[in-house]
Amino acid sequence: MENNDFWGIHKHHIVFRSQGGLDFDLNMIELTQEEHEGNHGPHQNRARDLELKRGLQEQLSELFPEKETFDIDTISRKLGRTRRYFEKYFKKVPNTAGMYPGFEVVKRLMGGRMY
């Protein structure tokens, strides 16, 4: 595997890119090849996939509490990516004067759905 397999370790998007997942550290997990592609891995086992997604959602909900609002700069800083990276993904997210409710931030980072 190109750049995804170092000593048998695979980087896995918890919310798959095909599901609207983005590239930020919390959405990435390192798994062995067996953990990644085996029968108990997230690609073959829906329960394991949901377990990882719910864990990520919980972490994001702590970073972005539902009743608070956040601007793109804060979102970018908390997730360790550039403002420009997130601006394009948050264009259609409901906001008031550039302030995004925590629930909407988490929902977008989870690919548009909650688990």
Predicted feature locations:
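Short alpha-helical "recognition helix" segments of helix-turn-helix
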Residues: T74-S76
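Short, amphipathic alpha-helical "recognition" segments used to contact nucleic acids or chromatin
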Residues: L52-F70
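Short Cys/His-centered divalent metal-binding micro-motifs
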Residues: M28-E51
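Helix-turn-helix DNA-binding helix
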Residues: F86-E87
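Short Lys/Arg-enriched helix C-cap and helix-to-coil transition segments
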Residues: K91-Y115
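Short linker/helix segments within small regulatory modules
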Residues: V15-M28
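Short cysteine-rich loop/turn motifs with clustered Cys
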Residues: M1-H10, T32-E35
